[in-house]
Each structure stands twice: as structure tokens, then as C-alpha cells.
Amino acid sequence: MSVAYKPEGYTSVAPYLVVDGAVRTINFLARVFDATELRRYPTPDGRILHAEVRIGDTVVMVADGNAGWPPIGAHVHVYVPDVDATYERALSAGAMSVQAPVKKDDADRRGGVKDAGGTTWWISTMQA
């Protein structure tokens, strides 16, 4: 019997977001993308050392920044069934608009928002 090299149900690549306000980011992901929290390791002062949430078929890892690992903005792309509804949920959850959903030169209708933790979320629905 061989030992698995990764947890069951995890993809080989997972975004790791180091943010300012990990709890706020986790709550945003739950509200906007229906993320399910899998793990949370808080520090004694309530910050998040490490957390994992599942969005669709992907695990996203989240942690609060610190002196050794400062928060850094990232861009993450997420496919959703309804880009317009998800974009509006993100704005209602406090995100700032980067780009309203629009169809350009590829098969996707895509919009972008930036959350309070500094992550830019590109939200798309394929419209072949």
C-alpha cells in the first residue's frame, strides 16, 4: 500500500493567500463563492496561522501576514455558473470593482473585484 502524497480531494496546485485579515477573507469567500472551510489554525491572539477553504473543486489556503511573511496582493481566477450574480455578491460583501463583467475576445464573460485583504478575484462564466 502506497502513502498518498497529498490529501484526498486536493488538487496538485493550490493558491496560498497571505493577507491582512484572514478571517475577513474567509468570510468573504464563504459569502461570495460559497466556500466551505476545511481547516483553521488560529494563533493565541486570534490571527490565522493557516486555513483552508474549498471553492468548487479547488482548495484555497489563507493566512494572516506577519513580519516575516507580509501580506501581498494576488490575482485569482474563479469560474462560476453566473458571473453577474457572483460579481454583485462580491460588491455587496465589500469588494471594490476592478472591472464590471464583460465579454471580450475569448469565450468568457469576466469581471474583477478586489477584496479588503488585497486579493483581486477574476470571476468568469464561459459563454461558448
Report each predicted region and the residues it spans:
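Short, solvent-exposed beta-strand edge segments and adjacent coil->beta transition regions
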Residues: 10-14, 71-75
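A short beta-turn/loop motif at secondary-structure boundaries
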Residues: 43-46, 68, 104-105
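Terminal peptide-recognition signature
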Residues: 15, 29, 53, 76, ...
